[in-house]
């Protein structure tokens, strides 16, 4: 028999950190599959359930392929240095190189611009963790486009958008690029993910055009139970979303998880109270609670590890209040009233992400320390903190957050316009025909989520699994 010996881990590998990072990544992945697939499936009309859920699966898959071939190193690899050190172009983007060798995957993970100390887990762990963040971003703005977007168009939009928009934004804020060097922070993606998704949703929906008026007039959720399941997966999955971003299983991860749940709970209650006292119906609604949940989750994302518990309460309260008024009043004003955002992505992700990012510059507590960072504002070896106006009486951090937000909004709008216009040119249009739009899933996929055969007729069976074809 072979003698039992200790596994020869590399000296830099910490099993606890590696395990937590993989668990956190899996939680974030579950937010997409099945989280968003089930949530969206419950929100759309019955005839669009299959198409919408399949687009979520396809977007997730396409992003992973892009991520392995060039996306990861483009966003988080060594900087290309197109300009002088310290300039915008010196920290603009990484390299178009694949992550495909044994050494690349199993070596110690490091940040491309050396803004973080070397991690205690392999590059494969970091690459997968960053992938699930990249994957969920186009899936978020998909929510604004459902019910009319060509399936073939989606196959092209995802890889192009990830490459042109997401990787650039991630490199500039997370990969040690220009805005990271200037001091802007985005703890888990309020800007890189949610603000950019909101902008892409607005631009994409404007280019594609609205749904058929019949579909807009009858846009009732097909299944609130599916919505509840999907929303629950999102909420608890967010523990990995924000809790994994310290990259270590430490106190800062625990604080991020607690703050995330506090802000979310406050967001739910705030939206319901707004509905009860200020809406036309004066009644609490389940969909309203889901909107409040999203506001809290999204708004705390850029600040989860920077604010204390009291700050988290204010983040949830302020974000839910602002987004509630925006949803109910801004949506009536041009140009918002002319853009058919099917699921309110512009509001619950775009505006909530912007509010949360700016609140970092106001509510960030210098006493909240993030460890493992090899850069500025040291509070002991390998750690730093961020101070908002409330504690420092300085608007410096708020200014840096504002400038980063302007970039995200501007570049995402330009990049999304380029991607959608190019795909429209290549395919001769982005919308399905009116005939297809009237039928939905049956016309596009020959499948239905809930088939209802008429009396005396057989259940509709997709042609590719029909007995005659077996």
Please annotate each region the language model reported:
Residues 2-470:
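Glycine- and aromatic-enriched membrane alpha-helices
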């Amino acid at each position: 028999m072979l003698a039992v010996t200790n596994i020869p881990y590399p000296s830099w590998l910490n099993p606890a950190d590696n395990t937590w990072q993989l668990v956190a990544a899996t939680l974030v992945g579950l937010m997409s599959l099945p989280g968003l697939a089930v949530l969206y499936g419950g929100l759309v009309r019955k005839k669009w359930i299959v198409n919408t859920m399949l687009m979520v699966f396809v977007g997730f898959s396409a992003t992973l392929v892009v991520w392995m071939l060039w996306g990861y190193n483009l966003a988080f690899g060594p900087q290309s240095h197109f300009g002088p050190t310290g300039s915008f172009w010196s920290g603009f983007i990484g390299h178009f190189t694949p992550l495909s060798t044994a050494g690349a995957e199993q070596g110690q993970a490091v940040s491309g611009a050396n803004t973080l100390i070397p991690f205690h887990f392999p590059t494969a762990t970091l690459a997968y963790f960053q992938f699930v963040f990249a994957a969920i971003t186009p899936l978020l703005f998909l929510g604004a486009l459902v019910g009319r977007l060509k399936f073939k168009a989606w196959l092209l939009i995802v890889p192009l958008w990830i490459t042109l928009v997401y990787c650039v934004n991630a490199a500039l804020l997370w990969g040690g690029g220009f805005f990271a060097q200037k001091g802007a922070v985005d703890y888990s993606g309020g800007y890189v993910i949610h603000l950019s998704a909101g902008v892409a949703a607005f631009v994409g929906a404007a280019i594609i055009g609205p749904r058929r008026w019949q579909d807009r007039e009858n846009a009732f959720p097909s299944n609130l139970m599916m919505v509840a399941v999907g929303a629950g997966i999102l909420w608890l999955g967010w523990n990995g979303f924000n809790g994994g971003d310290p990259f270590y299983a430490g106190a800062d991860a625990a604080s991020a998880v607690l703050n995330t749940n506090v802000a979310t709970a406050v967001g739910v209650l705030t939206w319901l109270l707004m509905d009860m006292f200020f809406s036309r119906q004066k009644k609490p609604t389940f969909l309203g609670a889901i909107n409040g949940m999203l506001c809290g989750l999204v708004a705390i994302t850029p600040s989860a590890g920077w604010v204390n518990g009291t700050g988290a309460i204010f983040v949830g309260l302020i974000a839910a209040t602002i987004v509630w008024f925006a949803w109910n009043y801004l949506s009536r004003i041009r140009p918002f009233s002319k853009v058919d955002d099917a699921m309110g992505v512009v509001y619950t992700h775009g505006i909530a992400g912007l509010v949360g990012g700016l609140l970092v510059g106001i509510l960030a507590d210098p006493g909240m320390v993030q460890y493992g960072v090899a850069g500025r504002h040291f509070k002991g070896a390998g750690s730093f903190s961020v101070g908002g106006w409330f504690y420092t009486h300085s608007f410096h951090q708020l200014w840096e957050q504002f400038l980063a937000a302007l970039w995200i909004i501007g570049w995402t709008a330009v990049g999304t316009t380029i991607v959608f216009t190019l795909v429209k040119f290549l395919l001769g249009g982005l919308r399905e025909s009116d005939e297809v739009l009237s039928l939905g899933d049956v016309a596009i996929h020959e499948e239905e989520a809930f088939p209802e055969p008429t009396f005396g007729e057989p259940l509709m069976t997709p042609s590719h699994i029909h007995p005659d074809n077996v």
